[in-house]
Swiss-Prot record:
Family, similarity comment: Belongs to the universal ribosomal protein uL16 family.
Cellular localisation: Plastid, Chloroplast
Source organism: Pelargonium hortorum (Common geranium)
Gene that specifies this protein: rpl16
Protein name as it appears in the record: Large ribosomal subunit protein uL16c
A Gene Ontology term for the protein's cellular component: mitochondrial large ribosomal subunit
Any Pfam family hit: Ribosomal_L16
Compositionally biased tracts (Basic residues): 1-23
Length: 135
């Protein structure tokens, strides 16, 4: 599971996901990619599940790049706790994904293999995505 080694602050505001992704929306490493079409928080578990699915599908061939990193802590209060008495403790990490963001890239394999592997990874994601090919 991905998580930052060290952060400046333990807890963060939730924030908003307005507009499209300004950075990380072009293919820069591989030839094929999975692009987000909706805004969402992707947990480190979801990112890892997608990566494992792709790796398992291409077996020994090709290279995979994970283009997102979960750097936002999500806090959760214990169950049966009354309101107030501060913010909960950090439970898991999420990556804030806006529409247009590249999630995974792949290279060194045939298009049909890449398409199959990326579609399996896409099924693990909680958002609509699309398969794209670099020009």
């Amino acid at each position: 599971m991905l998580s930052p080694k060290k952060t400046k602050f333990r807890k963060e505001h939730r924030g908003r996901m307005k507009g499209r992704s300004s950075r990380g929306s072009r293919i820069s490493f591989g030839k094929y990619a999975l692009q987000a079409l909706e805004p969402a928080w992707l947990t480190s578990r979801q990112i890892e599940a997608g990566r494992r699915a792709m790796t398992r599908n291409v077996r020994r061939g090709g290279k995979i790049w994970v283009r997102i990193f979960p750097d936002k802590p999500v806090t959760v209060k214990p169950t049966q706790t009354r309101m107030g008495s501060g913010k909960g403790s950090p439970e898991y990490w999420v990556a804030v994904v806006k529409p247009g963001r590249i999630l995974y890239e792949m290279g060194g394999v045939a298009e049909n293999i890449a398409r199959k592997a990326i579609e399996i990874a896409a099924s693990k994601m909680p958002i609509r995505t699309q398969f794209i090919i670099s020009k």
